[in-house]
Amino acid sequence: MLKIIDAKVIVTCPGRNFVTLKITTEDGITGVGDATLNGRELSVVSFLQDHMVPSLIGRDAHQIEDIWQFFYRGSYWRGGPVAMTALAAVDMALWDIKGKVAGLPVYQLLGGACRTGVTVYGHANGETIEDTIAEAVKYKAMGYKAIRLQTGVPGLASTYGVSKDKMFYEPADNDLPTENIWSTAKYLNSVPKLFERAREVLGWDVHLLHDVHHRLTPIEAARLGKDLEPYRLFWLEDSVPAENQAGFRLIRQHTTTPLAVGEIFAHVWDAKQLIEEQLIDYLRATVLHAGGITNLKKIAAFADLHHVKTGCHGATDLSPVTMAAALHFDMSITNFGLQEYMRHTPETDAVFPHAYTFSDGMLHPGDKPGLGVDIDEDLAAKHPYKRAYLPVNRLEDGTMFNW
């Protein structure tokens, strides 16, 4: 038995808020897990401190599956983003500990490497099409084989995915939600022009992706997918609200553009219909919000039965702890598709020293025992929590809409 004697929650804001769980065993071995829920961080802090940490003390850190089931099945109020994010933090930390005890990187404990590295995609964005293309050219020069393109929409003051003042993209930047204006018609008119220009400049030897961010109806998404077919996107992401699973059937019937969804999914039930009916090509569920490595491995295995690949969320709303965990997961599964990689700020990287590295369009998790990531608690303490909310959208007539 490897008894857990301490578990503490650390909140830090090196440019944005992150929540980290650190578990310590009686032998002095520590493991870290990410518990960040973007814009709702303190809800997970409370859930961990009030409901999970007391039940962790005294348990055997080796019993990862049993502890996972204890917190999931043992709770009548199972599931949901807060509980599953908290559970993911516990799961990551326990896998980190198990790897350190074994003296092996976690991917070796998950069955070993299925590939030499994890192919990632970067984010190129700009206020105009030409700004976006210029950024994409830089990513291609850095070795990226896949790039997500987002650009400002003419007639709209702000657009999802476009950074402010050329800084790292961070939508949750105000004490209270910023209200933005959205126009589907203007958006649908602009996106095909972006990808037409992208293919002219970038050529056909790089994968291109786009994120709609849940803002279309199924028929609108079908029309967009059809319009984008000539440019052979790797995927069209979150084209309709993720809970509208039946809507993907209509989209699928009208376009061959590959579809991706799932970064807000918490468990397999959220994606069951999409996977079984092969209504999507890529599942975007993440280690952070789907209950950790233990649960996501099961979801990926189910997806593999139906020829659906993974494409895990990897924006900066998750810390380098999740990024490391995602890479070990990605290395170990047969149906890996692509991994999102949005670079963290230097301040964040300093707080979370990590072993993973980027080269030739791929991330490599490294071979340090465990997850290969840690938290500098002294440095983290110098960056106190700062409340920040995600924006909200209204239509041009004032109607509240999806962000």
Curated annotation (Swiss-Prot):
GO terms for molecular function: magnesium ion binding; mannonate dehydratase activity. Pfam families: MR_MLE_C (PF13378), MR_MLE_N (PF02746). The active site is at Y160 (proton donor/acceptor), H213 (proton donor/acceptor). It catalyses: D-mannonate = 2-dehydro-3-deoxy-D-gluconate + H2O. InterPro entries: D-mannonate_dehydratase_GalD (IPR053379), DgoD-like (IPR034593), Enolase-like_C_sf (IPR036849), Enolase-like_N (IPR029017), Enolase_C-like (IPR029065), MAND (IPR034587), Mandel_Rmase/mucon_lact_enz_CS (IPR018110), Mandelate_racemase_C (IPR013342). Pathway: Carbohydrate metabolism; pentose and glucuronate interconversion. GO terms for biological process: amino acid catabolic process; carbohydrate catabolic process. Binds 1 Mg(2+) ion per subunit. Its EC number is 4.2.1.8. Substrate binds at N38, H123, E263, R284, H313, D317, E340. Mg(2+) binds at D211, E237, E263. Coiled coil: none annotated. The record marks A315 as: Important for activity and substrate specificity. Belongs to the mandelate racemase/muconate lactonizing enzyme family. GalD subfamily. This is D-mannonate dehydratase CC0532. It comes from Caulobacter vibrioides (strain ATCC 19089 / CIP 103742 / CB 15) (Caulobacter crescentus). The lineage of its organism: Bacteria, Pseudomonadati, Pseudomonadota, Alphaproteobacteria, Caulobacterales.
